[in-house]
Swiss-Prot record:
It comes from the Bacteria. Pfam families: Anticodon_1 (PF08264), tRNA-synt_1 (PF00133). It comes from Streptococcus sanguinis (strain SK36). Binds 1 zinc ion per subunit. This is Isoleucine--tRNA ligase. It catalyses: tRNA(Ile) + L-isoleucine + ATP = L-isoleucyl-tRNA(Ile) + AMP + diphosphate. Its main location: cytoplasm. The gene is ileS.
């Protein structure tokens, strides 16, 4: 037998190298076969519910890193809730209707207008479902646990029927109406857009300053006076029907030198405008408040048959322009509101493709709206005072990336104004994990207009509205429920397969249809109404879920999207918010903090991360960042996270290896019988348990990451395990001192594995497979540990906190000696301490082998003053000398008792005692040379 074989060198097959890219799919397959998700739900039946409702990603293309961050975050929360005693089923979902899928088919060469509509919609459906399957595999590869066999998909018949019933309840309450209000209109999509489908970019536009001649000054202005207007949308002048001034703004009538005309501008802007127009020696003839100009009549700049009325509006400012704006009720929300209030004509001169129509006049008809500025300038003639190109923030279609316009078209609206206060009151009851999120959603609801819910597209859920022969819309409770039942049985495709009369209840009549003829609406619903109905289609309709949901967790862009639409529909139907809590996340940026873009080549695909590092590293990264704000990710950042993972893994591997001969039932030592240092580590670990339990409950992932990394690297690796080798390797295998330490090792190993499970389920299960004494087959079927408290806990913590300070001072002294070449490793040291009374009391309280704790071979606690040249740190003096004696071949300490024993072993007395008591045969036969 060799001497080194008498050491308890921990042995384990648990590999140092994780091999995550290859192992993770194997684990995932095993979990599927074992039906782990279903077994976890069965374990928690009857326990308090926690429902995280999944916001549906759009089914188009592979997932990106933002998807991964969101789904992993949800998975961590659901897993932690399940292990904390909650019934927390997770139903993943997908949003499957809308323009992007139509655009993909168009790029693939599908010509919608050449196909039968039903055939086209089936192609859309097939494509959407193929994308659902693609993304499902992507999400499962991340280790996300959920009811993947029964997800919700917005195109399924049951979901579409639930959506129709949400609409029906809103219609019953009078919240659905038809109007010709201006809406965001995308000429590139040929459809109206919701606010959530708008994004802003800088756009260079031609701005014009021009004048309208006064026709009837109402005794205030003369007819040789011109009111000066500013616009950044020249095409809208074709539909201008009024001029709007601010009631409380001061306006001046001026006459520049050499001009026969008089002009009206805002007093505050006169100087800047005079410079812009080249006016000199401007004479101010009169000053009027805006309200005094109300109802003055002017003439359209070129269509002299059209009068433009001066009206008052709160939206007019003196921040730019002239303090006067022209008003085209067909091309703007503010224009529409003040125009309708003053009986102005709602006139629209642009068609659905952005082309000027015949009613714009022969000079404009057929031109693209954005190209008419030269024609407008020509038509204005000497009424044009100035023109310039300006760059300003402008709304774009978020899908096509093309600018949009405001355009009044007949649309279906969901009222927000009728129950706005009810929505705002519900926001106050929701718990927001960021106060700014609450303010943002509150302000959006407070300031938003009614919701245009109709879309002039094909792929979506039809609006369940019929029309009588006289054009009267029909949407009664009876007709809507009948449509819902048809959708439930056949899917919404039935709307396009059948005639209107075959979609109505049998025998249905209406006074507006004396001949019994009906037509049906051909518009579909805004896709935000689709996903915004998920609280009904999923949370209400699935028996395992409870409404309202406990948590909605999505990106911060969803304050204007899913959070918003879900809130409106839920309050409209039931008077309550669909969620009790909202947690939002920022965006994933590249390593430099730049937005990720395929064109910039700075995107990171989750699949690439999985191939290089494994999904565990992506999961750990999610906890390493504050995702409530924008976060950074790059392969370099992931390499750093991978290194942290390696440290955690190797530390836990050490614990596995050094508890391989430990049976917790037979070998565990009661807390009361532990050494002081072991009690300290037990208490510190339970503080960690408490911190992590609270952080899981509060969704504070970064707190968990920092706490675990700190405990593993500082408390374990840099302290407890650093000196542990001198005990677990060297002491007799069944000695009390070794079993004391193994008791702590095993407790930490089992519980920290459970704590890590929601974040690193693959690694946790791999560790668990080595813990043969644990009852649960899978760690995912266990519970999170509860934090314990212990007698004299604070006193023990105070003692060891003080010792850690002392240890730090001692390490400085050893480092100094190492630099001076007095010693090499710390085990070569004889450390003499000249303590003050506080330290002397402390070392007595520690009641441990201090030399062992400091990893030195010899320690002397000296009396009296320290010699000259001693190293002093914070009133404690140290002298470091090389230890006396020889190196023990077994424990590697330098000791004066080391000698060659009769059994061919150069060992110290302590090791000799262990050998003679535990290895009698080897002692009698003599040890082999190493």
């Amino acid at each position: 037998m060799k001497l080194k074989e008498t050491l308890n060198l921990g042995k384990t097959a648990f590999p140092m190298r994780a091999g995550l890219p290859n192992k993770e799919p194997i684990w995932q397959k095993e979990w599927d076969q074992a039906k782990l998700y279903q077994r976890r739900q069965e374990l928690n039946e009857g326990k308090p519910h926690f429902i995280l409702h999944d916001g549906p990603p759009y089914a188009n293309g592979n997932i990106h890193v933002g998807h991964a961050m969101n789904k992993i975050s949800k998975d961590i929360i659901v897993r932690s809730k399940s292990m904390a005693g909650y019934y927390a089923p997770y139903i993943p979902g997908w949003d499957t209707h809308g323009l992007p899928i139509e655009q993909v088919l168009a790029k693939q060469g599908v010509k919608r207008k050449e196909l039968d509509l039903v055939e086209y919609l089936n192609m859309c459906r097939d494509y959407a479902l193929s994308q659902v399957e693609k993304q499902k595999e992507d999400f499962k590869r991340l280790g996300v646990s959920g009811d993947w066999e029964n997800p919700y998909v917005t195109l399924t018949p049951d979901y579409e029927a639930a959506q129709i019933r949400v609409f029906g309840e809103m219609a019953k309450k009078g919240y659905i109406y038809r109007g010709a209000k201006p809406v965001y209109w995308s000429w590139s999509s040929e459809s109206a857009l919701a606010e959530a489908e708008i994004e802003y970019h800088d756009l260079v536009s031609t701005s014009l300053y021009y004048a309208n001649r006064v026709k009837d000054g109402k005794g205030v202005l003369d007819t040789d006076t011109y009111i000066v207007v500013w616009t950044t949308t020249p095409f809208t002048i074709t539909a201008s029907r009024g001029l709007t001034v601010g009631a409380d703004i001061d306006y001046v009538v001026v006459q520049p030198a050499g001009e026969s005309r008089k002009f009206v501008v805002a007093s505050e802007l006169l100087n800047s405008l005079s410079e812009k127009f080249g006016w000199a020696d401007v004479q101010v003839l009169a000053t009027y408040r805006g309200q005094e100009l109300n109802h003055i009549v002017t003439v359209h700049p070129w269509d002299t048959a059209v009068d433009e009325l001066v009206i008052l509006g709160d939206h007019v400012t003196t921040d730019s322009g002239t303090g006067i704006v022209h008003t085209a009720p067909g091309f703007g929300e503010d224009d529409y509101n003040v125009g309708v209030a003053n009986d102005l004509e709602v006139f629209v001169t642009v068609n659905e493709r952005g082309i000027m129509m015949e009613n714009a006049g022969p000079d404009f008809a057929g031109q693209f709206y954005d190209k008419v500025a030269p024609t407008v300038i020509e038509k204005l003639g000497d009424l044009l005072l100035a023109q310039e190109e300006i760059s300003h923030s402008y709304p774009f279609d978020w899908r096509t990336k093309k600018p949009i316009i405001w355009r009044a078209v007949p649309q279906w609206f969901a009222s927000v104004s009728k129950f706005r206060q009810e929505i705002l009151d519900e926001i106050e009851k929701v718990k927001f994990h960021s106060e700014w999120g609450k303010v943002r959603l509150y302000n959006m609801i407070r300031d938003r207009g009614d919701w245009v819910i109709s879309r002039q597209r094909a792929w979506g859920v039809p609006l369940p509205i019929f029309y009588a022969e006289d054009g009267t819309p029909i949407m009664t409770a009876e007709t809507i429920e009948h449509v819902a039942q048809l959708f439930e049985e056949h899917g919404s495709i039935v709307w396009w397969k059948r005639e209107a009369k075959d979609l109505l209840p049998e025998g249905f009549t209406h006074p507006g249809s004396p001949n019994g003829e009906f037509t049906k609406e051909t518009d579909i619903m805004d896709v935000w109404f689709d996903s915004g109905s998920s609280w009904n289609g999923v949370v209400v309709n699935r028996p395992e879920l409870t409404y309202p949901a406990d948590l909605y967790l999505e990106g911060s862009d969803q304050y204007r999207g899913w959070f918003n639409s879900s809130l409106i529909t839920s309050v409209a139907n039931h008077g309550v918010a669909p969620y009790k809590q909202i947690l939002s996340q920022g965006f994933a940026l590249d390593g430099k903090g730049e937005k990720m873009s395929k064109s910039l080549g700075n995107t990171i695909a989750p699949s690439d991360v999985e191939k290089q590092f494994g999904a565990e590293i992506l999961r750990l990264w999610v906890t390493s960042v504050d995702s409530s704000n924008d976060v950074r990710i790059s392969m370099d950042i992931l390499s750093q996270v991978s290194e942290t993972y390696r440290k955690i893994r190797n530390t836990l591997r050490f614990l596995i290896a050094n508890t391989s001969d430990f049976n917790p039932v037979e070998d565990a030592v009661a807390y009361e019988e532990l050494r002081s240092v072991d009690k300290y580590m037990t208490i510190r670990f339970n503080q960690l348990v408490e911190t992590i339990r609270k952080a899981y409950a509060d969704f504070e992932f970064l707190t968990i990451y920092k706490a675990i990394v700190n405990f593993v690297t500082v408390d374990l690796s840099a302290f407890y395990l650093d000196f542990a080798k001198d005990i677990v390797y060297i002491e007799a295998a069944k000695s009390l001192e070794r079993r004391q330490m193994q008791t702590v090792f095993y407790d930490v190993l089992v519980k920290i594995t459970k704590l890590l499970t929601p974040i690193l389920p693959h690694t946790a299960e791999e560790i668990w497979s080595y813990l043969e004494h644990e009852e649960e087959e899978f760690v995912q079927l266990s519970e999170l540990p509860e934090a314990q408290t212990f007698p004299n806990q604070e006193e023990i913590l105070d003692t060891w906190s003080a010792f850690m300070d002392f240890r730090s001072q001692a390490q400085k002294a050893l480092e100094e000696a190492r630099n001076e070449k007095v010693i090499g490793k710390s085990l070569e040291a004889h450390l003499t301490v000249y303590p003050n009374e506080v330290i002397k009391t402390l070392l007595e309280a520690v009641n441990s082998d201090v030399a062992q704790l400091l990893i030195v071979s010899q320690l002397t606690i000296a009396e009296g003053p320290a010699p000259e040249g001693a190293l002093v740190f914070e009133d404690v003096a140290f002298v470091v000398e090389h230890a006396q004696g020889q190196v023990c071949d077994r424990c590697r300490r330098i000791d004066t008792t080391v000698q060659e024993r009769s059994y061919q072993a150069l060992v110290c007395d302590h090791c000799a005692e262990i050998l003679e008591e535990n290895f009698a045969q080897a002692v009698s036969e003599g040890f082999e040379a190493n």
